[in-house]
Amino acid sequence: MSEFNFDPYRRYGGGMAPMAPQSRYVLPSYIERTAYGVKEMNPYNKLFEERIIFVGVQIDDTSANDIIAQMMTLEHIDSDRDITLYINSPGGSFTSLMAIYDTMQFVRPDIQTVCVGQAASAAAVLLAGGTKGKRTALPNSRILIHQPATEGTHGQASDVEIMANEIMRIRHQLETILAKHTGRSVEEISRDIERDKILTAEEAKEYGIVDDVLPYRKASLK
């Protein structure tokens, strides 16, 4: 069986360095008293209660399924209230990205997107894919867009041709989505993603990926 080092479905990873294995900070739990008694909580549970989904990992099938399940649940609870995605992600799988993106467009609630830290590669598409007028970034956020990455291929000539055609199809799909949400032409997007295009929060606003840069809430820092 032919083997490919490069998989366009899983190599849409962002950043200027390879993505390292993920490690998890141990989340604290706490007891919250309510009118119905006491319950054990953690920060993610509390965010979910406030209709906030935190995308703080690489985008793969597992994280995509979790994010989609949360969006569908929140739509079921209340289809008229916004859902907010906080994004701090280096990117990841293209098919996983598309699963989340399609769900964002499918559910009835508006989707607010907020970049904290970075939205690179696939994560930048999620950031741009939020509801127009409700896409934001914190002041020191880093946003990166680029073409789907390759690491070289080998195998039969017909297999290489199939994979080359597929990566071009994926690239065109990416360009079309970014053009739709930024208001720029497909041709301009195509030129810009030839190499890594790194944007500050203000540059991302000018480019059309976000609509506003959030000010700090501390009065002393305004």
From Swiss-Prot:
Cellular-component GO terms for this entry: cytoplasm; endopeptidase Clp complex
Domain of life, source organism: Bacteria
Single annotated GO MF: serine-type endopeptidase activity
Compartments, record wording: Cytoplasm
E.C. numbers: 3.4.21.92
Record carries keyword Lyase: no
Reaction(s) the record says it catalyses: Hydrolysis of proteins to small peptides in the presence of ATP and magnesium. alpha-casein is the usual test substrate. In the absence of ATP, only oligopeptides shorter than five residues are hydrolyzed (such as succinyl-Leu-Tyr-|-NHMec, and Leu-Tyr-Leu-|-Tyr-Trp, in which cleavage of the -Tyr-|-Leu- and -Tyr-|-Trp bonds also occurs)
Catalytic residues, chain numbering: 121 (nucleophile), 146
Major subcellular location class: cytoplasm
Keywords annotated in UniProt: Cytoplasm, Hydrolase, Protease, Serine protease
Gene3D superfamilies assigned: 2-enoyl-CoA Hydratase, Chain A, domain 1
GO biological process: protein quality control for misfolded or incompletely synthesized proteins
Assembly and interaction partners: Fourteen ClpP subunits assemble into 2 heptameric rings which stack back to back to give a disk-like structure with a central cavity, resembling the structure of eukaryotic proteasomes.
Family under the similarity heading: Belongs to the peptidase S14 family.
Functional description taken from the UniProt entry: Cleaves peptides in various proteins in a process that requires ATP hydrolysis. Has a chymotrypsin-like activity. Plays a major role in the degradation of misfolded proteins.
NCBIfam families with a match to the protein in the record: PRK00277.1, PRK12553.1
Protein name: ATP-dependent Clp protease proteolytic subunit 1
Primary gene name: clpP1
